[in-house]
Amino acid sequence: MDLLQFLAFLFVLLLSGMGATGTLRTSLDPSLEIYKKMFEVKRREQLLALKNLAQLNDIHQQYKILDVMLKGLFKVLEDSRTVLTAADVLPDGPFPQDEKLKDAFSHVVENTAFFGDVVLRFPRIVHYYFDHNSNWNLLIRWGISFCNQTGVFNQGPHSPILSLMAQELGISEKDSNFQNPFKIDRTEFIPSTDPFQKALREEEKRRKKEEKRKEIRKGPRISRSQSEL
């Protein structure tokens, strides 16, 4: 799978909602229960995509893919928040029945979880983009809060993802025994740790040099009138 194909696949993951159908409502919202099952399918697709990304074993391509993917992910998250907020959809309320609202709900839940996966598997790369972006910080804080109230993450294998993500990002205080299991043991996702770390350092140096060159080009220039004095 080449770079363009992989990016296209990721965008399908970001934009394809899995809204549940059904109109019956009880104390256990049946539409939400249906969605939870579909969410499990979506999670398997997301984790497979990340496994394929890690197996590229090319930090330069990983940077490029994650750069595009994160921008797309937060754009979807921001648009979905706007839709849900405008319609006064409560995360702990009945599962929305309107198709547009169902898609927005799905996008928030799935992309927040997916971002958690990315953070835990590629923490250094994500911190490079995330730590200086206040808008992303506000969006993911909102996303985590929304997801925590939906009931989707109450039980099952995905229940720890929100807490681990929040601790890794510094959004919540780290527990005394906090460990990022994917950061410590990369054997499932990254075949060779040492070359990865070396390539990561090289890519970070290259990008810092690019940023410095851009800053120099953007620096103050002597106006024509000043040069004539």
Curated annotation (Swiss-Prot):
Q: Which GO terms describe its molecular function?
A: protein-macromolecule adaptor activity
Q: Region annotation Disordered: residue ranges?
A: 193-229
Q: Name it.
A: Coiled-coil domain-containing protein 134
Is Glycoprotein given among the entry's keywords?
Answer: yes
- Indicate where this protein is primarily found: endoplasmic reticulum
Q: What is the lineage of its organism?
A: Eukaryota, Metazoa, Chordata, Craniata, Vertebrata
What does the entry give for GO biological process? Answer: angiogenesis; embryonic hemopoiesis; embryonic liver development; placenta development; positive regulation of MyD88-dependent toll-like receptor signaling pathway; positive regulation of Wnt signaling pathway; regulation of ossification; regulation of protein glycosylation
Q: Give the multimer and partner information.
A: Interacts with TADA2A. Associates with the PCAF complex via TADA2A binding.
